[in-house]
Amino acid sequence: MARTVFCRKLQKEADGLDFQLYPGELGKRIFDNISKEAWGEWQKKQTMLINEHKLNMMEPNARAFLEEKMSAYLFDDVEPTIEGYVPPEK
């Protein structure tokens, strides 16, 4: 049976992540409060951010930048700015 969480991003009950995907306290917070659906949405945004900013994920500054954007997106409902991207109409 799938684990469910009240997703803070989507503001609804949804299937939770199968395991902690990110290390540390932030990872625990994500595991406890973010759904698979919201995590999948973040992964798409993350890919766009990495490409747009030409981030090298071996660099600590790039990882810190992405972590800041991830936390803001998942918990503070702050949409990352991706130049030239127009979200689809709902």
UniProtKB/Swiss-Prot annotation:
GO biological process: cellular response to oxidative stress
SUPFAM superfamilies: YggX-like
Keyword list, A-Z: Iron
Source organism superkingdom: Bacteria
UniProt-listed InterPro entries: Fe_traffick_prot_YggX, Fe_traffick_prot_YggX_sf
Gene Ontology MF terms: iron ion binding
Name of a matching Pfam family: Iron_traffic
One GO cellular component term noted in the UniProt record for this chain: cytosol
Family: Belongs to the Fe(2+)-trafficking protein family.
Functional summary from the UniProt entry: Could be a mediator in iron transactions between iron acquisition and iron-requiring processes, such as synthesis and/or repair of Fe-S clusters in biosynthetic enzymes.
Stated name of the protein: Probable Fe(2+)-trafficking protein
Protein's organism: Alteromonas mediterranea (strain DSM 17117 / CIP 110805 / LMG 28347 / Deep ecotype)
